[in-house]
Amino acid sequence: MPQSKYRQQDIRAPRGTTLTAKSWLTEAPLRMLMNNLDPDVAENPHELVVYGGIGRAARDWECYDAIINALTKLEADETLLVQSGKPVGVFKTHENAPRVLIANSNLVPHWATWEHFNELDAKGLAMYGQMTAGSWIYIGSQGIVQGTYETFVEAGRQHYQGNLSGRWVLTAGLGGMGGAQPLAATLAGACSLNIECQQSRIDFRLRTRYVDEQATSLDDALARIEKYTREGKAVSVALCANAADVVPELVKRGVRPDLVTDQTSAHDPLHGYLPSGWRWEEYQAKAASDPQGTVQAAKRSMAKHVQAMLAFSEMGVPTFDYGNNIRQMAKEMGVENAFDFPGFVPAYIRPLFCRGIGPFRWVALSGDPEDIYKTDAKVKEIVADDKHLHHWLDMARERINFQGLPARICWVGLAWRQKLGLAFNEMVRRGEVSAPIVIGRDHLDSGSVASPNRETEAMRDGSDAVSDWPLLNALLNTASGATWVSLHHGGGVGMGFSQHAGMVIVCDGTDEAAARIARVLHNDPATGVMRHADAGYEIAVECAAEQGLNLPMIAATQGKR
């Protein structure tokens, strides 16, 4: 029998050094689960929705209570198993095993459709975990800001001689992921017009300083963009409207942005993309009363949206999919050339993945922002020669408001993750920070995801859909001693289109933690280098050889073995 997914209760993680659980290794997942549902973090916390349509932290409130209860009682040699947001077992393992193992939204491939998943969800038998919602390591929109920033910067390098001043980005979606776009564009030096159909989401981004201002109409928005680009100012403008209407209208008017993308929740047509001409309340009601008709209406609107994006691409405007599967939805509605513009990974990000570079993140369990500022300084000390990274950290401190527990995102690769993790652990040991640090990442990383319309689109060897890689990543992180490990399906692009894994490890200042950190923070990014080397990317082969990886089928890594 389905239990309640709604509770009028605000959740905030404990701060300080007083433990609710029996050790920091179980206190950490407890605090991070609670932090995912902090009103300053989650999109709809009273319904357990963290971000990304219906990406939840727990299946229902009864399951949430049971998870919290289990974590408070968990012993140092026990492991909690969580199945689609429901705690299903506690087993005796050992002290270096993960304290929590999570599997979310996984379906046998033939049944891996939204229709079947929604049936299970309605019966209380499943939960959509997105990527970091159900794996308890979401840190608000900051979690994707740097990745979006790196994408815009690389687009500027490729198309505009590395200078986005006086240029503007057209995009849509200001949810938990899309909400990073306006700030990322501003940090990259560009203006942006950000279309969002829910005023509450615009209010959230204005309050957290991710978007600068809101226009009253499309004409007003364009006037603001024209003024700011003429003045060379990087200002983000939000517009409350439907992208399915506005983007085609801009094509009709002959307006020419400098970059075009989209980050609406198009991956979930039943819950995440407002059909043209509908109000949000109407959409929610019809999703319950006529799900099939609602999905078709949403996908028809997506088709219009993608046709407009294609028109911009044909004008010569750099246009790219930002990983929400909108091209696939449009293709299913008859837009045969929907994939004529690329996804952001093959267009701009893959060379980073080849070196194991991706969204490394950490959180101060103390709740003290000073702990993050001290770790920022430590990153600069260790990665001493990377001016681009130092610039990012300076901008992040100046511009990014913490949401919930203080956190930082920082794209680093195989060469640095282990060193940083060990340094953070030493800071905890010496009392330089006031409580342990947790280190995790997005599932959007170099070796932890198979997603043919996003992270693994257009792989050199054609292995886009091979999902052995995230399974191996999860298994290796478990064997290496991560504090919690997760294996999900459908994140980012929806049911049937992705499989992906996550890990989190606690720096509690002990020697045992140092040994686990050394294994996990080497092996985890190394799987990304391995995956790309196996696909034939020379950058990855070179990185594997430089970092001493042992890849039996890659001659360059064998040396004198």
From Swiss-Prot:
It is an enzyme of class 4 (lyase). InterPro entries: Urocanase, Urocanase-like, Urocanase_C, Urocanase_central_sf, Urocanase_CS, Urocanase_N, Urocanase_Rossmann-like, Urocanase_sf. GO terms for cellular component: cytoplasm. It is found in: Cytoplasm. The active site is at C410. Pfam families: Urocanase, Urocanase_C, Urocanase_N. NAD(+) binds at residues 52-53, 130, 176-178, 196, 201, 242-243, 263-267, 273-274, 322, 492. Its EC number is 4.2.1.49. Pathway: Amino-acid degradation; L-histidine degradation into L-glutamate; N-formimidoyl-L-glutamate from L-histidine: step 2/3. Binds 1 NAD(+) per subunit. GO terms for molecular function: urocanate hydratase activity. This is Urocanate hydratase. It comes from Citrobacter koseri (strain ATCC BAA-895 / CDC 4225-83 / SGSC4696). The gene is hutU.
